[in-house]
């Protein structure tokens, strides 16, 4: 059996790089570690970290196709982020103009969670730990 060590990063393609960079950095609190414009591909690439750990590779490409359907299309369904206080996290998102679904309780763990979306409609989850 393959012995994976960890998830290294998640790649996200944005339709508007600057808008998504602002969302992930200014709203969600990621840090931009490195950024490069790749002229041959007309594409930005930004490396984002959370709490010092490289997590998201943010890309832009000219005219990317829209996401198929939300959320039950094949492939990646959503990204989930752990938070200590879901009410505070939801309030922070709403203050930044981000709509959240009502907070629910996971029937298996009894933990609270909610969903919201990035600027391109990628489903994101907050999960209280």
Go through the PLM ranges and name each one:
Residues 1-18, 76-81:
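N-terminal beta-strand motif that seeds the catalytic metal site of vicinal oxygen chelate
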Residues 2-3, 36, 47, 90-129:
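Vicinal oxygen chelate
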Residues 6, 42-44, 75, 110:
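Exposed loop/turn and edge beta-strand positions of beta-sandwich/beta-sheet ligand-binding modules
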Residues 72, 79-86:
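Mid-chain, well-packed structural core segment of small domains
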């Amino acid at each position: 059996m393959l012995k994976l060590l960890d998830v290294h990063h998640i790649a996200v393609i944005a339709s508007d790089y600057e808008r998504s960079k602002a969302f992930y950095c200014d709203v969600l609190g990621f840090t931009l570690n490195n950024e490069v414009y790749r002229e041959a591909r007309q594409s930005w690439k930004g490396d984002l970290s959370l709490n010092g750990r490289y997590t998201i590779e943010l890309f832009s490409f000219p005219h990317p196709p829209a996401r198929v359907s939300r959320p039950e299309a094949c492939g990646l369904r959503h990204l989930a982020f752990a938070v200590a206080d879901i009410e505070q996290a939801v309030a922070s998102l709403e203050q930044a103009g981000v709509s959240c679904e009502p907070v629910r309780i996971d029937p298996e763990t009894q933990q609270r969670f909610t969903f919201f979306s990035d600027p391109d409609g990628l489903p994101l989850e907050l999960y209280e730990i």
